[in-house]
């Protein structure tokens, strides 16, 4: 049975070897002459107007986390819908519990004001 996965293992091994070889060759043979211009951020050919490292508002992180959570919900929901006939009532109720937990979490975030942009 493991013989079926051997070509995948060979492919991953060769890919890893090529990636490590390319990185190693670049590190050994590449020039190491950093100067101020090479270490500065690049902004369309102009000198940087201000520091490129600005703090982000926490609300962006909250929206990103909510997006990831509901994106994962979709990733679980589509395969579940495909195999729903085969998994029976246990699979149905397991997904309903999962969706209920997500809905409760969404309502909690909504009530806490995480979605308001004041």
Swiss-Prot record:
It is found in: Cell inner membrane. HAMAP family: NDH1_NuoA. Keywords: Cell inner membrane, Cell membrane, Membrane, NAD, Quinone, Translocase, Transmembrane, Transmembrane helix, Transport, Ubiquinone. It catalyses: a quinone + NADH + 5 H(+)(in) = a quinol + NAD(+) + 4 H(+)(out). Belongs to the complex I subunit 3 family. It comes from Coxiella burnetii (strain RSA 331 / Henzerling II). It is an enzyme of class 7 (translocase). GO terms for molecular function: NADH dehydrogenase (ubiquinone) activity; NADH:ubiquinone reductase (non-electrogenic) activity; quinone binding. The lineage of its organism: Bacteria, Pseudomonadati, Pseudomonadota, Gammaproteobacteria, Legionellales. This is NADH-quinone oxidoreductase subunit A. The keyword NAD applies. It is a multi-pass membrane protein. Its EC number is 7.1.1.-. NDH-1 is composed of 14 different subunits. Subunits NuoA, H, J, K, L, M, N constitute the membrane sector of the complex.
């Amino acid at each position: 049975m493991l013989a079926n996965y051997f070509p995948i293992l060979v492919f991953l091994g060769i890919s890893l070897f090529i990636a490590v070889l390319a990185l190693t060759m670049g590190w050994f043979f590449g020039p190491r002459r950093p100067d101020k211009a090479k270490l500065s951020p690049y902004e369309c050919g102009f000198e940087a107007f201000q520091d490129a490292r600005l703090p982000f508002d926490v609300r962006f992180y909250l929206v990103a986390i909510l997006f990831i959570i509901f994106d994962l919900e979709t990733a679980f929901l589509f395969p579940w819908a495909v195999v729903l006939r085969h998994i029976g009532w246990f699979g149905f109720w397991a997904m309903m519990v999962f969706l209920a937990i997500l809905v409760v979490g969404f309502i909690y975030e909504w009530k806490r004001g995480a979605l308001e942009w004041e």
